[in-house]
Amino acid sequence: MIWLDITDPKYVLFFKGMLPLLKKIDEVIITTRGNEDYSETHRLLELFKIEAYCIGGYGGASKLGKLQARLQRQNGFLSLFERLGKTPQIFITGASVEGVQTAYGLGIPVINFADTPIAGHIFSLQALTILSRLTLPLSSLVFHPFVVPAQCYEALGVAKENIIAYEFIDVALWLRDLKKGKDFREELGLDSSLPCILIREEEYKAHYVKEKLPIIYESVHLLSSSLNANLVIMPRYGSEGLIKEFGGLNNVHILEKKLDPSEFYPYIDLLIGGGGTMNLESCYLGIPTISTRSLFLYHDIYLLENRLMHHAKTPQEVLFFARNILSKLTPPVPNAHLFEKEKAGFEKIVETLKQRFFTPN
């Protein structure tokens, strides 16, 4: 039995293409987490009709809350395996401390997909994230995208032969063949003749983000009063606070449901992103992108060096870039060649797993 713990939305999209290959090897079970303020991952699994056991929830921003949630989930995993009457042969994850520690404690090999080992873009031991410190040393095998140096993983004691780079950036897996889906603007009742700006909050509760900055929210107010455009906010943790702050603005709309990428990317003219994954997605698709995030990771530097993205430090800079972009819109041209040194896929990765963990000695 192969066990995956999928704990954030990015890894739903990431592992979706891997599941059919894994199911050819052995039975696969998937666990996830979800609660009222953090249901995006669970809803995305449901959207793609991926069956999963929902074990525990998200602990929030506090250290105590995170620890309590992890302990509850670990007990939940043990109860699940007891109900199933069997223990997994391998464990696969992208960002699950409790999954890694449960698997390690049970003697289950840990396969880790890790793309954010440090909180920054220049290596130092001090920059290693809490997530990395709690998971990578317990990993039997670590896979990472080519833009992140192997040094980040070696520093935590992972042997060189157990660190494997793949020659693509994750978002290429699910965006390469993106087709136009149902136009989300119709459901929101937006005027399709106006430019459409999608806005994504920073992952301010994440382990590698030090504080919640106001720039993205101040930018919404400034853009709303300065541009004749549709502003659509995609919440990260919950919509209640956003509705309270922006609900009275006629040209600001807040998404309440989870959408497939095919339903919104083909219909937006600009992405303003405080996070990482959606900035990468829009840059891959050739959509103009403004980053407001509070720190640079290796991926951000790669996008900036290749002139795929702007970075703004103030709402005024956001407005400047937005006006300039909207004044000379052209059809987006995908940048696949910068994201795929070789065709994105899981075939080589799954073959490695078969050889290492499922081939009789």
Language model segments and positions:
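C-terminal amphipathic helix plus adjacent low-complexity
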Residues: 329-361
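Conserved nucleotide-sugar phosphate-binding/catalytic loop shared by glycosyltransferases and other
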Residues: 6, 26-69
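Catalytic binding pocket for nucleotide-activated donors in carbohydrate/polymer assembly enzymes
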Residues: 284-330
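Catalytic donor nucleotide-activated moiety binding site of glycosyltransferases and closely related
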Residues: 48-51, 55-60, 65, 199, ...
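A nucleotide-sugar donor-handling region in carbohydrate enzymes
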Residues: 139-212
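A donor-sugar binding/catalytic signature common to diverse glycosyltransferases
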Residues: 90-102, 112, 263-301
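A conserved, positively charged/aromatic
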Residues: 112, 119-143, 265
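Donor nucleotide-activated moiety binding/catalytic core segment of transferases
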Residues: 72-81, 238-278
